[in-house]
Amino acid sequence: MPGRHITDNVVVAFETMHTIGKRKKGKEGLMAIKLDMSKAYGQVELGYLEVVIRKLGLCERWISLVMMCVTTVSYEVLINGEPRGKITPSKGLRQGDPISSYLFLLCAEGLSALIKKKEAVGLIRGVGVSKFAPPVSHLFFVDDSIIFCRATMEECKQVAEVLDTYGKELGQKINRDKTSLFFSKNTRTDIQNGVKDLKGNVGTFRNSGVYDPSKINSNLKDN
């Protein structure tokens, strides 16, 4: 897209994480939740996908072509080297298919809408990198998601409610063992423990792929 760069989200994620990392004072802490979905592509409900792309107002011809592509998939099983019938999946996108990543991002618009709805009434507040900067509440990297909010039990419960609703609609389940949390230094220990019980393991994103600062700098130089 004109005026957009492939590393824009990465830079925003890095700057927001830096803001959280240097926060040492204040009554409320800041936090980030790096989500890991179990079998993200394989659990997509095709009915949900159709509802989302219709809500986005895409043309009927395009919707029909896409749904035909994802609903006519079948697999053959070889037993002792011989094909033994076909298996027709009831859900899921084929990982590696050129269009699958784009369709998954369209599905993620549902999660974005749920978060924005909570933001609109002040139940979830994002993290701003400066006093006058707009708050950032979430960023998506295809099937990778990161949510920013205040480190309070109230906001964490709102995030958990959003993820539960999204998971039921899309068929996704959060992998608690691989979901990571990052807190600012002024977050109370009891809050960290309470949030950990809801979400997963406390950790940093230093070694989590696109959030690695060295990789961000490398990507910027390469581009």
Regions found by a protein language model. Give the residues of each.
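Nucleotidyl polymerases of mobile genetic elements and RNA viruses
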Residues: 1-223
